[in-house]
């Protein structure tokens, strides 16, 4: 039987948003259900994000989490969650000026 990763094992390198890949940083506003989230992105738009099956089973998402989001490029404002950042990774993103601290506080204050 295969062993799962330990709780304190390293996850590898933290992926960053890339304009070449089309990814952007978003904050979970609401958990809709059935594997979907409503996310507020750094461009000010609200999108409907789908959680892929491999993440749905292993990574729990809740309101206020910062995620890396890949829009599908269609007009209906939908896309897919690529990665969920941990608390220390969010602090690094704020320090690197990739994520506005006001956006994080705005969503945290609305809860």
Swiss-Prot record:
Record bears the keyword Lipid biosynthesis: no
Domain named S1-like: residues: 12-86
InterPro entries per UniProt: NA-bd_OB-fold, RNA-binding_domain_S1_IF1, TIF_eIF-1A, TIF_eIF-1A_CS
Pfam families: eIF-1a
SUPFAM superfamilies: Nucleic acid-binding proteins
Disulfide bonds listed in the record: none
Molecular function per GO: RNA binding; translation initiation factor activity
Keywords: Initiation factor, Protein biosynthesis
Cited PROSITE patterns: IF1A, S1_IF1_TYPE
Chain's role: Seems to be required for maximal rate of protein biosynthesis. Enhances ribosome dissociation into subunits and stabilizes the binding of the initiator Met-tRNA(I) to 40 S ribosomal subunits.
Family: Belongs to the eIF-1A family.
The name this protein goes by in its record: Translation initiation factor 1A
Organism: Aeropyrum pernix (strain ATCC 700893 / DSM 11879 / JCM 9820 / NBRC 100138 / K1)
Name of encoding gene: eIF1A
């Amino acid at each position: 039987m295969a062993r799962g990763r330990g709780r304190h094992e390293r996850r590898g390198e933290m992926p960053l948003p890339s304009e070449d890949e089309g990814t952007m940083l978003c904050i979970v506003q609401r958990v809709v259900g059935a594997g979907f989230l409503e996310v507020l992105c750094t461009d000010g738009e609200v999108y409907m994000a789908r959680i892929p099956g491999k993440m749905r089973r292993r990574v729990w998402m809740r309101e206020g989490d910062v995620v890396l989001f890949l829009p599908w490029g269609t007009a209906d404002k939908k896309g897919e969650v690529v990665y969920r950042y941990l608390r220390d990774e969010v602090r690094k993103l704020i320090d690197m000026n990739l994520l506005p601290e006001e956006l994080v506080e705005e969503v945290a204050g609305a809860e």
